[in-house]
Design a protein with these regions (language model features):
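Extended, low-polarity segments enriched in aliphatic/aromatic residues
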Residues: 2, 8-34, 38-318
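Edge beta-strands of extracellular beta-sandwich domains
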Residues: 383-393
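Extracytoplasmic
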Residues: 395-472
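Solvent-exposed segments in extracellular or luminal domains encompassing
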Residues: 358-374
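Short beta-strand segments within Ig-like beta-sandwich modules, predominantly Fibronectin type-III
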Residues: 355-360, 427
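Proline-enriched interdomain boundary motifs that mark the N-terminal boundary
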Residues: 319-328
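Short, solvent-exposed loop/linker segments at the N-terminal edge
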Residues: 330-337
Length: 472
């Protein structure tokens, strides 16, 4: 993935001053339990590469967060070794009494804002592309949610208590249709959220048909029954929502009021609902319109009939040097266990692994004595055109305990039926959380427990090099 924020790069360079904080709001809806609908690590890596390595933003000034979810491991495991000083934050950490809603919502938790957003000088909204709910008359079938999730709904992950907002975004067809209040508009207009955002990015590498579903292929051109494999980027939050909706609606039905909040936001000074929004002084939060048809995908600026949206497809040079993949078969080396690196590149004149020339496609076994970063670079015309980094962690101080000793320490209990139970003091309303992990009855196990951050979040539990759980 080569993510270059052309216009936004200029914007950041012109405005950014050393020491200012940047918050990156990602979507980690799956809580780290699987990779069904989480932000893709490669996409966040590409963004951090731009900010840190190209724009020279200090790592400690960047926070990647989703304050409503516990799934930060979806990206932490891959990115923290490469960018260790970036702050990776998930559940918790809210500032009270920050957000005012224009109608219906008075819950104190809903008025609290994630500290990462509150303290940031700039926001980058990095959302996913997905239909949130199927059209239905039964709110239970739709999980009581909105039509699509993109940059607007993404900010629900910045709010302390989300359920009070759900009523205003639901489509019960006959209950709440067009021209009604929508709390997403209040978030889009808020000075610490929409008002503080440099760029809106939609990670459309994959598209999901429902809030907890698996990715689906798109049938129409240019996807041609393939993965969407795309990014959308804009400085206009209403425009990017409009385009996301058009793409999704061209492949699957959406809720009847899916674009209600877009109409409200585009006309926030005089919305169809008649609601006096808190941000009404802004008159409009952006441009809302729909394309002419799903085959040509032309908006008013494309058609030269108005000054609305222009959908511009950034051309990619098919001959550009690229890293197709670069990964290791395990994230850490324990004692003498070998680790294998794999890579595939294209269109380069020279490929370097930590400065040494290697084949364009290949693999190698490494046994670093200490944790070590590996950098794969592809050169053409004497300059590096593509680069990717990964870190292999090395653990040599491995201590062995039998079951009885482990039970005495209280760190693990291996039960007769082959379950390992780990307990922590963080996670549930009662202050305790229990995991049960199926393990073979015999064998050798390595337990890696790591902790990061100034509070109890996040912490991670690994069993045999596999993430077991987090937030202990």
């Amino acid at each position: 993935i080569r993510l270059s924020l052309v216009g936004s790069e200029m914007c950041i360079r012109d405005r950014y001053k050393e020491g200012e904080k940047i918050a990156i709001k990602v979507n980690l809806n799956d809580n780290g339990g699987s990779n069904i609908i989480d932000a893709t690590p490669q996409s966040v890596y590409a963004l951090l590469h731009q900010l840190v390595d190209i724009m020279n933003v200090p790592q400690h000034c960047i926070t990647v967060y989703d304050a409503q979810r516990r799934g930060i491991s979806a990206i932490y495991t891959y990115l923290q070794p490469v960018y260790p000083d970036v702050v990776y934050q998930n559940w918790g950490g809210f500032v009270p009494d920050v957000i005012r809603y224009s109608s219906e919502i008075t819950d104190p938790g809903a008025m609290s804002l994630a500290r990462a957003a509150y303290e940031a000088d700039y926001m980058i909204n990095m959302a996913l592309m997905k239909r949130h709910s199927r059209p239905t008359d039964n709110w239970k079938d739709s999980a009581g949610q909105t039509g699509i999730t993109a940059t607007g709904k993404n900010q629900f992950g910045s709010i302390g208590n989300v359920p009070p907002l759900h009523l205003s975004i639901r489509d019960w067809s006959k209950f709440r249709g067009m021209g009604t209040y929508n709390s997403i508009v209040d978030l889009m207009a808020h000075e610490r959220l929409g008002g503080n955002t440099l760029v809106y990015i939609v990670d459309a590498m994959y598209v999901n048909p429902i809030h907890n579903g698996r990715a689906v292929r798109f049938k129409r051109a240019p996807f041609n029954d393939g993965w969407t494999s795309s990014f959308l980027a804009s400085n206009d939050q209403v425009a990017i929502e409009s385009v996301v909706l058009d793409f999704i609606r061209s492949e699957m039905p959406v809720a009847a009021n899916a674009d209600n909040f877009m109409h409200e936001a585009a006309n926030i000074g005089n919305p169809p609902s008649g609601i006096r929004y808190e941000g009404r002084a802004q008159k409009s939060l952006g441009v809302h319109e729909h394309w002419n048809n799903p085959d040509d995908r032309m908006y008013s600026r494309n058609l030269k009939t108005g000054k609305g949206i222009e959908l511009y497809r950034v051309p990619l040079d098919a001959e550009r040097p690229a890293i197709e993949y670069f990964y290791s078969d395990r994230i850490s080396k324990i004692e003498d266990q070998p680790v294998t690196l794999y890579w595939k590149t294209s269109n380069g004149e020279e490929v370097l692994l930590n400065g040494e020339v290697v084949a364009a496609n290949g693999s190698c076994v490494v046994k670093p004595e200490t944790s070590l970063m590996y950098e794969l670079a592809v050169k053409k015309g004497g300059t590096v055109q593509a680069v990717q980094k990964l870190v292999v962690r090395s653990f040599t101080d491995v201590r062995c305990y039998d079951v009885k000793e482990a039970q005495t320490e209280g760190s693990a209990i291996v039960e007769a039926e082959g379950f390992a139970e780990f307990r922590g003091e963080k996670g549930s309303s009662k202050g305790a959380l229990t995991w049960q992990i199926g393990v073979p009855a015999t064998g050798e196990y390595y337990l890696l427990f790591s902790y990061s951050g100034g509070s109890q979040v996040p912490s991670y539990l690994y069993l045999n090099d596999q993430l077991v759980s987090e937030n202990i």
